[in-house]
């Protein structure tokens, strides 16, 4: 408030602001800095009586201002300088009746501006005899004026003249006593601005000095009561002054109305927000509330999250695989003594394959890219077709899965696990996956076509295997199961239907629909949480598991089959019936380990139980716990110690029976639980088997094909009499209707995309695979 642009004394008695009086027409300079000069110039007033009278009045005025200062600010504010009026020449002030002094007013009735620094003076020093610096006669006025103008031009631009304080060129300004008549004028210089600072000595003494000094910042102290007054502005024409007064009155009238319109709660909230912003140690906290968003927005956000995660996972995985292929080729080239030109050709060939693979990854496959040759298999959730790719003419087996049934039957985890197993290995013991894609209704797995059929077809055709043939197929099954376990998966559905025969007569495992890798995406609970399924949805569609959702198996429930095991003919009838059972929504529990039924946890050793059941069927002719009803089959499996028997009319070796009994036993006593596949390989039944070269050995049976599309080893005749499942038939009708209406089936819904994000896959070496016919 003090020491700023304007310095005024405030009269607490009448509420008026004290302003310095207008000076004589003679211009005065404020004291210069010590470097310029050490003397002050002043106009000597000849009337000594008026000077004495003025001095006495000034003493009274200083006492009154000191009292006003103490009353307004209190005794504690010692750092605030006391305000003193300027010391004008004699006769420039007039005394009014109440004893207070007010500046003289010009003819227009306006108080003259006090923006000029030259109006501020201390009490003048005493006259020093005939010293020309402090006195002059009337004849020296013009000479003194010239000297002042010359000094003003030499000093800094912040030295001003008294005439700059008068506004609008108002006429003559005459004081009350009429002794001084000043011709006012307004200066246009941009430097005519008030700039006054005070030194510490001035503040401590309570006297104002016109000496220019650097500003001294005082520490801010709280004021108990502060009075704000508007500083005087330069005079304006009467018309502009009236407009400003009207605007101020309107603002004052509108301010209470606006304050009354603001609710008290909002005012308090604003104050709290301002207080928090002013607090330097406060932090901003954000609360995540996705539940406030709509369901569609939440689904889209979840889809974006999964897509981003899958994108970076696949990108990193591809970069690692590409680097490994480069290192592998360079290592191979380094082991041969080939020329640099040949090595360069090999590296260039690899680079070309990498480029082709990148283009393939960017290509979106669809059902229209394949031509269906024949349906070679049907199941509960889809079917298997023999297809031919239109652009290359390659033959593949296409497995089609219905998305809606995956939701209803809680098969989302199993589908993801099957895709991960097929895409995560290049083992010769597992069916190769070349592509995988999807549309709005189906999931598609493009796999290699194995024309030899499956092991069930061979059992139906030959009924029994010899021990040598059984040893060969069981040895290859052990190597295939070992590969699955090394990948970190459990098949859980090893049966003759899932053991396929390739074109050379060797076996490969397929149908990993019930496999699990103990990954979060292989757990049914992961997809339940992802889709936020409630209890109503579970009751309407998904099965209500009695235990862990990841242990759910659709092959546990079977239809009742009336069987009598009196002769081989009836066994063949049972096998054909069981083939039909594989095409229906029910499955077969004949090869399931008892610990899976109990929901008490199981490990990889459950697959070795299934191996023992298949070995029993190859040597005896039927499964070890075959019964007329599924309940009886379940009872026999749970009581295997009493129900496992070997018929007397079928002769098998002691080693074969011992291996079967050691596989069909309790999990903690089962062969392979401690040492894995190596423990089974060391059994006497497999004595003489070369485990490293068994795949190069000629197989007991090599399928003979008439063409690459020959399907004689598949039960295509039986499939003609097997109707499509209701879900598949309904989906086919919906697809036809969508095509008629011009709707693209490839436009996926967001909800159905969530569990299948990342399902698309393309194999790198698809162009060089010899298994693709």
Curated annotation (Swiss-Prot):
Q: Where is the composition biased (Polar residues)?
A: 50-59, 178-217
User: Which family, according to the similarity comment?
Assistant: Belongs to the protein kinase superfamily. STE Ser/Thr protein kinase family. COT1 subfamily.
What are the boundaries of the region Disordered? 50-111, 177-275
Gene name tied to this protein: CBK1
Q: Which UniProt keywords apply?
A: ATP-binding, Kinase, Nucleotide-binding, Phosphoprotein, Serine/threonine-protein kinase, Transferase
Binding residues annotated for ATP, in chain numbering: 376-384, 399
Could you tell me the EC number(s) of this protein? 2.7.11.1
Would you tell me the Gene Ontology cellular component terms?
cell cortex; cellular bud neck; cellular bud tip; incipient cellular bud site; mating projection tip; nucleus; serine/threonine protein kinase complex
Function, please? Protein kinase that seems to play a role in the regulation of cell morphogenesis and proliferation.
Pfam families listed in its UniProt record: Pkinase
Q: Reply yes or no: does the keyword GTP-binding apply.
A: no
What's the name of the protein? Answer: Serine/threonine-protein kinase CBK1
Q: Which reaction does it catalyse?
A: L-seryl-[protein] + ATP = O-phospho-L-seryl-[protein] + ADP + H(+); L-threonyl-[protein] + ATP = O-phospho-L-threonyl-[protein] + ADP + H(+)
User: Active site annotated at which positions?
Assistant: 493 (proton acceptor)
User: Which part of the chain is the Protein kinase domain?
Assistant: 370-686
Q: Which residues form the AGC-kinase C-terminal domain?
A: 687-771
Q: So which domain of life are we looking at?
A: Eukaryota
Question: What is any one GO biological process for this UniProt entry?
Answer: establishment or maintenance of actin cytoskeleton polarity
| Sample GO molecular function, one term | ATP binding
* Amino acid composition bias (Low complexity), ranges on this chain: 218-256, 265-275
